[in-house]
């Protein structure tokens, strides 16, 4: 077996055999297949696709590249959630402690920023002292004592995916549906969770730009999970506009704490509660009330204990960028569009994301929104504030935001897109 023949098969729109898939995943994990060769194969997969048999085998090979975890020793059922990635998508941060407060155990293995979307681990690492890297023993201890853990997948869990995930981010192959589905589900199945809720984003700020592609991805992942014995359900949610009022690491942590304190933007609260209800139902927990757990402080208590158990200080001041630039409304009227993709790229260019997989991120960088679609604005009022430690980045970020919003005359009717577009089980 050689990698060139595998690349040629997919380049020429052929079906990869089980033997080819098993070999290339194993060889890439061991370093026999180089990054540039796997990049070529990933691009061929993006351009020519994979059928269900290939995707299932690719996922199984990724799982087989490492260990599998087991949570049978826990006294409560496990529930996990995964988002396909969006702009301002900080939902995992309030969601994990909220679901834990309602009686489930939440082993949330999360990732770094990918493309223009933020990464949960990058956000949490803006909290002084917080650790993303835990041993399996540490992870089980945090989960057992606080009910929730958010951490990086260990090197032993789907190591093939860890390498490929970073490679896709810097080779223009993030959007390949077979690679998205297998990446997510290999980690989640290997992780050993009993139930899984998928938040499949749709719109300009998502990797799935239209509802048809999002449904294909959701059905593929639900099928992979169900066939592996994991109770899996997917919500398709809107990502044409950023979630909440912030995009950036420390900015989003601050907003998440507001939600846990019983406040926060309405769209973030709505989606957090909806996903919590799905997770609790999938885990078989009846009569829990996520809204009550937000209101009575129990979700906040679980957050504080979870952060502290991973070395973080929940009371510490979060990093603030050294420089700010305010973008003002050019006219008065109704803000009818605010493009999530432009905001995501803008935040990324300010330093909230990476250009290369080894790049650091700026904890305080990002974009703070002062208006959302449907709001009335006045000429000259702040629309958004850009944050960065590197002022020369402002021009680059502003270019991404150009043409990314519309202001219609005052009195123009506005109909908001629902946050939840579909449910697939």
Where are these regions (language model features)?
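Alpha-helix C-terminal capping segments
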Residues: 47-48, 94-107, 187-192, 227-228, ...
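A glycine-rich helix N-cap at a beta->alpha junction
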Residues: 123-149, 219-225, 229
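Well-ordered secondary-structure scaffolds
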Residues: 5, 10, 15-18, 28, ...
